[in-house]
Amino acid sequence: MLVQVICGRRDAAEAADSLQELERLADTAGIEVAGQLTQRRPRPDGATLLGAGKLADLRTACEDRGANHVLFDNELNAVQAYNLTKALERRVFDRTEAILQIFARRARSSEAQTQVELAQLEFLLSRIPVLEAQQRFKGGIGMRGPGESHLQLRNAPMRRRIADLRQRLAAIQARQRRSRAKRPWPVVSLVGYTNAGKSTLLNALAGADAYVDDRLFATLDTKTRLVRLGEGRQILLTDTVGFIRHLPHGLVASFRSTLDVACQADLLLVVVDASHPRVQDHVDVCRATLDEIGAGGVPSLLVLNKCDLPAAAETATHAAERHPLAIPVSAHSGLGLDTLRLAVAEELKR
């Protein structure tokens, strides 16, 4: 069951889009959605987020539909997660944990696996009492990947492991920065909202075959390809993990070495899906995340991808009006790619 509590004056359309995104996260995590439940409240209940009546409705709905998991769009603190687990007698988790689950499944390189393990352990450190309660209920998806073997650890050993992982990632980041300092070509980094088509754009510009999947967070590891802009100019184009609303701060911190490529780039291509009805929200999320990782000052171009889709006819027009320098493209059909190459070349001359 998917659950969302809408508090205060939160925009209804934005909340609906967030819930739809949560459903896609569930699908990516391999969870079948049995139904949805929403509640609007002036403020969240400190103990269970939901009101008592709605909590009873949720338990009944889970029983009627055979739902073994309850996924909240809202971030749950440890107390709320513990109380909800006891009240519902089911596996309860939130958007943050769902994203961690997806990252654990998608991590391939040693660096990505180390970053996922760090994020998992920092999350588990705050949830040990909740996990003990949840272990009494069967059918949970649980934490998978490197963090799983640490469920029984307690604070001191876990903190030592976290410190070790941070040190390891700091060494990776330092090594990567030294390597980038020797690069023979300018580096342009593809950043943007998850599932905006960054990997497809990388393939289209570089004539490459990077992995592409119509699911959230298909890319965790940084991929770099050589791209020819014309007139003898070449760049290194990188593609890295996508952004999403409410991306956990701990996850951003854990993936610092991967996201550092954006901070060190000569130019950023901020890619969003022009066919999405709330494309401006995605632009705002991207800008905020870039600020958070320290890349807000890097020169950038806004790229409106998927402009060939029928749904983009109106949304892309509005986005272009708000961002007159944005470049509409279609990585799938090739529309606008020559214009994008020229824009990149001109920007790098400055």
List each model region and its residues.
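Charged, low-hydrophobicity low-complexity segments
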Residues: V3, G8, S18-E21, L25-T28, ...
